[in-house]
Every structure is written in structure tokens, then in C-alpha cells.
Amino acid sequence: MSASNYATERETAEGKVFTVTGGDWDVVVSGTDPINDERIVVNMGPQHPSTHGVLRLVLELEGETVREARSVVGYLHTGIEKNLEFRNWVQGSTFVTRMDYLAPLFNETAYALAVEKLLGIEEQITERATTIRVLMMELNRISSHLVWVATTAMELGAINMMLYGFREREYILEIFELITGLRMNHAYVRPGGVAQDVPDEAIAKIRDFLKLMPKKLEEYEKMLSGQPIWLERTQNVGVLDATGCLALGVTGPVLRSAGLAWDLRKTMPYCGYETYEFDVPTHTDGDVWGRYLVRLAEIRESLKLVEQAVDRLRPGPVMVADRKIAWPAQLAIGVDGMGNSLEHVAKIMGQSMESLIHHFKLVTEGFRVPPGQVYVALEAPRGELGVHAVSDGGTRPYRVHYREPSFVNLQALPAMAEGGLIADVIAGGASLDPVMGGCDR
């Protein structure tokens, strides 16, 4: 830099004279000030214990304060929605169940409701099948919330809570295995009803669980609700008020913890929820603590719903009567071990060529769905789970798109994290309960 920037020049009889003005002193002084705008970019994940290898958070830090947060998704992309376009309508159930793998029965039910709406058979779904759907979804809601409280507590240092939460979830998974044959990814809820009936031994096991779980909830509250460290890590952390939730499209326990009692089971009932008695828990703080209280309260409400559903179960079919849609259901286990009765096998294999042809085409090609498009939404453990299904009149979906609450809710993470401490990012993110299988799908 030239001398004229720091000194004035004038001519005298003795020659050129420079007068130092000290113009650079301000620059020197400001250079010694504390550096207030220096930021560090930190990648939290995907190789991070709390992001489970499937989520990346890019954080700009000023000291320990988060100034900017961005979530990077796509590490668990599976192309499920695209794959649905190459499978028949029934086979779609085996794909959608694998998206949000902690709430598979909600994925299946939303898909089945959309297909049934396209077919125009909503009124033909049997009462027993509808009741079983409610029963299974509410058990699934409890198991999903148990995973949330267990893993969130573990990430904040309460290791014992993780062990207890998964212990009770195991009981529910055993019930699912008894009913569907699988612990996860059931493909149990099908267009037209459910795959098979609920056995009597499963009902007895569910009633035992209804007696056990309220006592376990009291244990959870004793372990966490009055624990000083838990309170410090959750209260006034990850705050998002109702206005912010509505602006970002956030639903589920996060929205209800901000004081808005929005639950699709009440506001837009489906599967006969309007005939059940239950409350919609809310809180007003809009922080991690409020979301914790809402989810524990929702477990209690789901226990009420499960009990009501079990009491409502009456003998009857679990699949629509239309044999152009329904696969053979409620068949006794036969000697072939594949769930076919001897009478059914004898008919399609030895007595009726037409029955064999129909059975073969129904399984391999599937049924046709009239052209049209529908949107169906239900209340999943993480919020509004919506399905936009489009049919061109063929045996396969033209397009199926899921409005996944994990993806939508994750967009609220910057609003919750920015301005807070880096130590609170995990608590705030965990309180959203994102499942990346559903987010990326």
C-alpha cells in the first residue's frame, strides 16, 4: 500500500515533507480485537453414533454456538416408490412396509386405504378387518414411541432407559410375529383387508401386555421425569412454537407439544377411529421436554385404543368377498405347509381348470384398478403420513408418492438448532424422531 494512504505530502523549501497521520492505526487496533466472525464447519454424521450412518448434519459453529445447520439426506435411498410402478397392487404392500421400518403397519394401511379408495370398495371392508387394522396400528405406535424414548435417552446418557424400552418393545414384536409371521416388514395389511386372521393366543398375549405396560410407564417416569440431568438436557432445548410448526408443515407429537391438538384420528377420522374413545395429548412448551411428555401420554392413549379394539373383535371374514380382488384368506394350514386347505388345493389342482387359471392370474398379474388418483392420510407415530396414488387402469400403480413425516419434520431442524449449543443438536434432532428409511425411501 502506498505511503499516501498513511501520510500527507507537501513541498517545502527544504524539499518534500511527509506528515504521518496514523491512518493505519485503526486497522492495527481492530486486528487485535477478539475475532467474532470466525466460524468452523463441522460435519456431524453420517459416521456419527447419533446419526446411525444415514444422516449428515453440516453445522457452522461460532465457539459452541450453532449459527447455521443443514441436514443432508439420501444415504438410505432405496427407490421404493419407483419400484412400485413395476409390481402389481398387492405386491406393493411388501415394498411400502420397508420405508419407515419402525412403523411398517402404518405404511401398509395408508397404501391399502388408497388402493381401496381407487377401487371404490371402502364400504366393503369387513368390520373385523378394520378393527384388526386399528389394533395393529396402535400396537405399532406404542413400539415406535418405545424406540424413541429408549434411543433418545441413550443419546443423552441414560443407558438404562434404552434397555428397558427395548425390553417392552420386544413383547410387542413377539405379538406381531405371532399374528403376521414376521417381527418387522409384515406386508400384513393388504388392499381389501388383512392377510390372515388374529389367532386366539395372540389375543391372550395382548391382554397380558395391557396389564404390564402401564406399570412400565410409571417406571420410565420415575427414571426420567424427575431426573435433574434429563430436565437440563430437554427443557427449553430445541424450541419450535406452533407458528413455526405450521410454517414448516411439521405434524405429529412435535406439533402437539407446541399446543395444537391436531391428530388425524380426530380431525379426519379413518378406520372407524371416530367410534373410539381417546384423548389427544398436548403440551405448550414446544421443546424436547414437551415432546417427551406427549409421546408418553400417547402410549397411554394407544393402550386404551388397543383394549377397545380387542373387546370389539367379533368373528367374521378379514378380507372382502370379491374374489376378483381377494387372495384366498382364512385357509387352514394344509399338508403342503403353504396355508392352503385340502379342499382348496383339490379344487384348483384337480377339479376346476377355471379356478386354477383365476388363481394363477390373480397372483401373477393382479387385479385392475380403475383410472384415477387419490390422496389418503393417517396419523403415524411421527405425524401425517399421506399417500398419493395414481392409476392408469392397469394392474400396476402409475405412481405412488408418500408424504413422509420424517422428511418434512427434518426440515425444522435448522430452526430448532440455530442459536443453540452444539451439545443440544442431538437432543433437538432426536426429538423430531426421524426415521431415514421413510425420509429417503
Curated annotation (Swiss-Prot):
SUPFAM superfamilies: HydB/Nqo4-like. Transmembrane segments: none annotated. InterPro entries: NADH_Q_OxRdtase_suD (IPR001135), NADH_UbQ_OxRdtase_49kDa_CS (IPR014029), NDH1_su_D/H (IPR022885), NiFe-Hase_large (IPR029014). Its EC number is 7.1.1.-. It catalyses: a quinone + NADH + 5 H(+)(in) = a quinol + NAD(+) + 4 H(+)(out). It comes from the Bacteria. Keywords: Cell membrane, Membrane, NAD, Quinone, Translocase, Transport. Its main location: membrane. It is a peripheral membrane protein. GO terms for cellular component: plasma membrane. The keyword Cell inner membrane does not apply. The keyword Cell cycle does not apply. One of its GO terms (molecular function) is NAD binding. It is found in: Cell membrane. NCBIfam families: NuoD, PRK06075.1. NDH-1 is composed of 14 different subunits. Subunits NuoB, C, D, E, F, and G constitute the peripheral sector of the complex. NDH-1 shuttles electrons from NADH, via FMN and iron-sulfur (Fe-S) centers, to quinones in the respiratory chain. The immediate electron acceptor for the enzyme in this species is believed to be a menaquinone. Couples the redox reaction to proton translocation (for every two electrons transferred, four hydrogen ions are translocated across the cytoplasmic membrane), and thus conserves the redox energy in a proton gradient. Belongs to the complex I 49 kDa subunit family. This is NADH-quinone oxidoreductase subunit D 1. It comes from Salinispora arenicola (strain CNS-205).
